[in-house]
Amino acid sequence: MNKALFLCLVVLCAAVVFAAEDLQKAKHAPFKRAAPCFCSGKPGRGDLWILRGDCPGGYGYTSNCYKWPNICCYPH
């Protein structure tokens, strides 16, 4: 019984370590939480940010158009 309990504890600890490592990688993952969108009069595809009043910083957005209550942000 003690060996089985010890084995379960080891497996649980290993799962916690691997889950924490995966979360650290996810924090630095280079992806945006935006959907594709298109604005009339603008070439290419923009990023649709849902329920935002302005474009978030750090992504290089230079122009936008509003699609109420969302905003479509263009990087070029």
Curated annotation (Swiss-Prot):
S-S bonds: 37-72, 39-65, 55-73
Tissues and organs where the protein is expressed, per its UniProt entry: Moderately expressed in the ectodermal tissue from the distal and proximal tentacles, body wall, and oral disk.
Compartment(s): Secreted; Nematocyst
Keywords, comma-separated and alphabetical: Cleavage on pair of basic residues, Disulfide bond, Hypotensive agent, Ion channel impairing toxin, Nematocyst, Neurotoxin, Potassium channel impairing toxin, Secreted, Signal, Toxin, Voltage-gated potassium channel impairing toxin
GO MF assignments: ion channel inhibitor activity; potassium channel regulator activity; toxin activity
Function: Blocks Kv3 voltage-gated potassium channels. Reduces blood pressure.
Name of the protein: Kappa-actitoxin-Avd4g
